[in-house]
Amino acid sequence: MNKTAEELLDSLKCASDGLASALTSVTLKFNCAFISTIVLISYCFSWLAIQALWNNNIFSNSTRLILIVCLLNSVVHQTTVMETRITQIYRSIVFASEPCEILFRSSECEIELYFYYLTNYFSTYSVFSLTFDRLISHYKSKYYHMHQYFIAISLLVLQFLLAILSFYIAYHGVPLAGYVPMCNYYPKMAVHHITINDVRTVVMVSCIIVTGFAYYLSVKSEKQIQKCSYSPGERYSAYENVTTSQSVCILIVLQFSCTMISSFGVNLLLMMQEAVSEETFTKVGAFLPGVAYANLCLPLAIYFKTKLTIQNRKLRIAVMISMYGDVGEHIARLKKSWEY
């Protein structure tokens, strides 16, 4: 039965008129330029974000390590996205008048399949690592600050295993039969692909709720510490917790929004499949790589959030200096208060 299905898919080598028209259209060429621009901008901001994380202690060491690894993963994913677009445009130019040569056989795309979906899943499950990082920092604060790198590495290993498991469920043993317009399309016989996407959506929604709760707890805790504690270390730790939790909330919401816009758009097109031509479906679908947009938002959010937090710190320091004068005056005032 599978062999018959494979043979049937392999026999559909030629692109339909609508699909061939879409693949050779100006819209797809513009899409290649647009996505490539998105990728190149994400490269620049990934480098700036990594530098910002490396040189500043805005986030805890555990969160910084997780974010740096996620940024490196995003670079690999973006490179794969751009490569699939460029090879598609190249083939559409070379075989513009040959609809039976313009499509890619799924077996030709095996390497892209591994890189694209593994990095895609790893990127999605970063929300899992970041959420648990925040939970541990709140509920096991002392342990967290003593073992930050161990916690980060453990969460990253778990994140990688989740990505591998998702890839295994979706594509293990799936015959690479049939033809696809681009190499980032999943094989036509991968029946569990949509199930994995649904699971990822549930994971992201759950992480948004949990991280929002962790942020609420960290804000509440910081207010209490500011009232009751005069320890600079404890007060700064609480402030760092709030800043990190807020940033993680923003990152997860951005990731979810980008992915959901893509999923909603594709699902809407599928629902309207009878009313929408194959040509229109292909053209619009090419502009909906949600993870590619998420991988642009990630470094942008990290970079600008870091800069904003540094600026806020400087303002706080300036306020303190204006209130207490220079350091010498402040020390003298403290000594005087201690004498009484």
UniProtKB/Swiss-Prot annotation:
Single GO biological process annotation from the record: sensory perception of chemical stimulus
Alphabetized UniProt keyword annotations: Membrane, Transmembrane, Transmembrane helix
Topology within the bilayer: Multi-pass membrane protein
Transmembrane among keywords: yes
This protein's record includes keyword Transmembrane: yes
Pfam families assigned: 7TM_GPCR_Sra (PF02117)
Family matches, as InterPro entries: 7TM_GPCR_serpentine_rcpt_Sra (IPR000344)
A GO term for molecular function: G protein-coupled receptor activity
Location in or out of the cell: Membrane
GO CC terms, sorted: membrane
Signal peptide residue numbers: none
Membrane-spanning residues: 34-54, 114-136, 150-170, 199-219, 250-270, 284-304
Family: Belongs to the nematode receptor-like protein sra family.
Protein name as annotated: Serpentine receptor class alpha-23
Native species: Caenorhabditis elegans
